[in-house]
Amino acid sequence: MKNIQKILPLYFVAGTQDCRHLGENLSENLLFVLKQALEGGITCFQFRDKGKFSLEHTPSAQKALAMSCRDLCREYGVPFIVDDNVDLALEIEADGIHVGQSDMPVQEIRAKTDKPLIIGWSVNRLDEAKIGENLAEIDYFGIGPIFPTQSKENPKPTLGMAFIQTLRNVGITKPLVAIGGVKLAHVKTLREFGADGVAVITAITHADNVQAATKALREASDEYAK
């Protein structure tokens, strides 16, 4: 059985759209940030490349970038997850896939491969968590958005940090990673409330010093585990 908790302490999510402020070469921007984040100590990376500022409409370039990100993650022994795109995840042999409530059902994903694919599931409501708790195909929940976020178009209602505590109090036992506007100052409380880790985008991609910011986030998350 996979030890999912070990990969969740600092879960980095990004695509080319999150690094466009760094210049015109979208692929190089993301690879630069990812390498610095890996040096800083991320424990997992989710390739989430979507939206009008991404490579979504140039599939060949997007696939090539995904493979480069995958290879970089493997150099550091960090799991590489693909967001939503199940076919891409399977084709390039990603370590996992993360899907939302309206994406391919997790039972179908699990049936597509006999490899030990990590499957994450986005949760925004208590009833969703209760349903997912009983689905053996799901390895962890992505809970959010915790705070307002600019990283998603039309984000769902914010939940607040106490929602993590609520999930634990009602008996949700699956590993949880909190996402959505999470910053360094929030990490300790989210971990205390029962999150197995935090997922961040701009806290890393927009940091003045990516490696240092990543290191601080990792240390804050690890501090709770001591």
From Swiss-Prot:
InterPro entries: Aldolase_TIM, ThiamineP_synth_sf, ThiamineP_synth_TenI, TMP_synthase
Top-rank lineage group of the source organism: Bacteria
Pfam family, one: TMP-TENI
EC number: 2.5.1.3
CDD domains in UniProt: TMP_TenI
Binding of 2-[(2R,5Z)-2-carboxy-4-methylthiazol-5(2H)-ylidene]ethyl phosphate, residues: T149, Q150, S151, G181, I201, T202
An individual GO BP term: thiamine diphosphate biosynthetic process
Coiled coil: none
Any single GO CC term annotated in Swiss-Prot or TrEMBL for this entry: cytoplasm
Keywords: Magnesium, Metal-binding, Thiamine biosynthesis, Transferase
Pathway field: Cofactor biosynthesis; thiamine diphosphate biosynthesis; thiamine phosphate from 4-amino-2-methyl-5-diphosphomethylpyrimidine and 4-methyl-5-(2-phosphoethyl)-thiazole: step 1/1
Annotated Gene3D superfamilies: Aldolase class I (3.20.20.70)
Cofactor(s) for this UniProt protein: Mg(2+)
Residues engaged in binding Mg(2+): D84, D103
Cofactor note: Binds 1 Mg(2+) ion per subunit.
HAMAP family: TMP_synthase
Similarity-based family: Belongs to the thiamine-phosphate synthase family.
Function, in words: Condenses 4-methyl-5-(beta-hydroxyethyl)thiazole monophosphate (THZ-P) and 2-methyl-4-amino-5-hydroxymethyl pyrimidine pyrophosphate (HMP-PP) to form thiamine monophosphate (TMP).
Name listed for the protein in its UniProt record: Thiamine-phosphate synthase
Lineage, top ranks: Bacteria, Pseudomonadati, Pseudomonadota, Gammaproteobacteria, Pasteurellales
